[in-house]
Amino acid sequence: MKKTGYFLLAVIVIVAAAGVGYWKFSGNPDALREIVLEQCLPDQLQHQNPAPCAEVKPRAGYVVFKDRHGPLQYLLMPTYRINGTESPLLLEPATPNFFWLAWQARGYMSKKYGHDIPDSAVSLAINSRLGRSQDHLHIHISCIRPDVREQLDNDLTRISTRWLPLPGGLMGHEYLARRVTESELAQRSPFMMLAEEVPEARDHMGRYALAVVRQSDDSFVLLATERNLLTFNRASAEEIQDHSCAILSSR
């Protein structure tokens, strides 16, 4: 009986992994990289025109790009080759703090919307190696799901300054949560916080997805979820976002 159970479990894992692989590679995983390196960066350097990006900062090492999904979603991406959360470059002190830069770029959402969008409605997210469709690092700048916003508001006083499991998880998946100040977020990359503070995370960064959300007390919550095929968790932190931005119509 036990052997049968183990066999079925193995089959489930294999099928789940195959499904993830198909989903990931069914398109062009280098599409974003080609846009950045072959269009946005050359156009900015040669013609001082960031198109098709919204902004190109060669010296700072990043671009901001309007994503085609959702009316207000933007992506922050490096101007050089970094695949994703698994890249050792993200743990180098000289690497830009991409999450902080993404937070500074949230104003593009308001500009597109035509009105100021409150910080509480904004979220940042990056997916894991198997939870993404593109192999160029990109942080999603978009609206937070209203139900996730409500849950994090309710958990405000229970979120520690250490990485601890978020009570109840999010979207049916387990998450770690850590509270940081604005100054901490500006000075230290969430990638480094995860790698240095969560046991064994440094050696398996590609398994993790990360998100950043502003709280009502002006602190930030860092959220991390680890890939777990047994629970069908591809570690896609983008799941906490709502690219249709329903939260704006409820305010």
From Swiss-Prot:
One of the GO biological process terms: CDP-diacylglycerol catabolic process
Domain of life of the organism encoding this protein: Bacteria
Gene3D superfamilies reported for this sequence: HIT family - CDH-like (3.30.428.30)
Alphabetized GO MF terms: CDP-diacylglycerol diphosphatase activity
SUPFAM superfamilies in the cross-refs: HIT-like (SSF54197)
Transmembrane parts of this sequence: 5-25
Compartments, as annotated in UniProt: Cell inner membrane
Catalytic activity, reaction form: a CDP-1,2-diacyl-sn-glycerol + H2O = a 1,2-diacyl-sn-glycero-3-phosphate + CMP + 2 H(+)
Alphabetical keyword list: Cell inner membrane, Cell membrane, Hydrolase, Lipid biosynthesis, Lipid metabolism, Membrane, Phospholipid biosynthesis, Phospholipid metabolism, Transmembrane, Transmembrane helix
EC numbers for this chain: 3.6.1.26
A Pfam match: CDH
Pathway where it operates: Phospholipid metabolism; CDP-diacylglycerol degradation; phosphatidate from CDP-diacylglycerol: step 1/1
Membrane topology: Single-pass membrane protein
Family statement: Belongs to the Cdh family.
Alphabetized HAMAP family for the sequence: Cdh (MF_00319)
NCBIfam families (alphabetical): cdh, PRK05471.1-5, PRK05471.1-6
Name of this protein: CDP-diacylglycerol pyrophosphatase
Organism per entry: Salmonella typhimurium (strain LT2 / SGSC1412 / ATCC 700720)
Taxon lineage: Bacteria, Pseudomonadati, Pseudomonadota, Gammaproteobacteria, Enterobacterales
